[in-house]
Amino acid sequence: MADLSIQGLCALLHLASPQLPVGGFSYSQGLEAAIEHGLVTDAGTARTWIADALAHGFARCEAPLWLLLRRAWSAGDEGAVHEWNQWFIASRDSREARAETLQMGWSLHSLLRSVPWGGEAFAPRIAQLGALVEGAGLAYPTAFACACAAVDADEDHALLAYGFAWLENQVAAAIKAVPLGQVAGQSLLLALHPLLEQAVCEARRRASEAPPRLDTMLPQWSVLQARHEHQYSRLFRS
């Protein structure tokens, strides 16, 4: 990894913050349905669930796609941005999952448009994000990758920040819905740190292949996300 400046670190901490007003806290990505069906009942089963989603979903599809989007933004390749944005939306195989990424993408675009992120030079990219919002939809990783490119954040550090935000949100959902205590939740998050590093390395390998190797094999995760749409009592929107 390249050296990270203080300014770059602050930008990544800002984007990865749970205080970022994009609504990530309101989604569990199927975890709540897994709890409802008795698959996740304690810290141990929560760790297994999140670790599997990280290794077989995030590392194989979402993270390499994020890298491809980050590289496309840096290269000014609008065609590639559009292609990988559509690819990511298509990879969300339930109504709630698609609604999640589109809502969060819209919210991040609105935020970036309202604050001086990246300075005046960022204005053309804001317009490109707006065109996606008005067109086929803006996926959240597309907007996040654009924000990272605007401040020239190193892609490995930026992907780690993106992944940590995803991981922290999953643990927060487990704390609320299992439920787990705060100490148990932090212990769970700490135990997953090494797996996040492995996921970033796997994503880098997959994104660098020709063609990029993108796949997910999480049928139970997909079924539970679809079942969540009809779950009677729930805290989360996915």
From Swiss-Prot:
InterPro entries per record: UreF (IPR002639), UreF_sf (IPR038277)
Main location: cytoplasm
Any GO MF annotation of the entry: nickel cation binding
Annotated Gene Ontology cellular component terms: cytoplasm
Subcellular location(s) per record: Cytoplasm
Highest taxon listed in the record's lineage: Bacteria
Keywords: Chaperone, Cytoplasm, Nickel insertion
Entry's family note: Belongs to the UreF family.
Its biological purpose: Required for maturation of urease via the functional incorporation of the urease nickel metallocenter.
Subunit structure, interactors included: UreD, UreF and UreG form a complex that acts as a GTP-hydrolysis-dependent molecular chaperone, activating the urease apoprotein by helping to assemble the nickel containing metallocenter of UreC. The UreE protein probably delivers the nickel.
Protein's UniProt name: Urease accessory protein UreF
Organism: Delftia acidovorans (strain DSM 14801 / SPH-1)
Taxonomic path: Bacteria, Pseudomonadati, Pseudomonadota, Betaproteobacteria, Burkholderiales
